[in-house]
Amino acid sequence: MKTLLLSLVVMTIVYLDLGYTLKCHESENLDDHVVCEEDETMCYKFTFVPFRDFEIVARGCSASCPEEKDVVCCSTDLCNK
């Protein structure tokens, strides 16, 4: 009986995909965040400075880290501050 219950628990976890979902900031307002899609395992922060003393920051989820100069990636919840 115990073996049957253990098997059912394992099957439930496998089939329901109780996996971890990443949360990333997505705007200038650090109180806002988004739950990433299953294939998006990285948070990114892209900083663009078109003019002196003027900065544009983009944040969000990504499946991989772009190899751009001003992109910082991380893989824990809300790490892209």
From Swiss-Prot:
Free-text tissue specificity from the UniProt record: Expressed by the venom gland.
Keywords in alphabetical order: Disulfide bond, Secreted, Signal, Toxin
Gene Ontology molecular functions: toxin activity
GO cellular component: extracellular region
Subcellular location: Secreted
Signal peptide start-end: 1-21
Domain of life according to the entry: Eukaryota
Intrachain disulfide bonds: C24-C43, C36-C61, C65-C73, C74-C79
InterPro entries found in the cross-reference section: Snake_3FTx, Snake_toxin-like_sf, Toxin_cobra-type
Family per record: Belongs to the three-finger toxin family. Short-chain subfamily.
Protein name: Three-finger toxin 3FTx-Oxy6
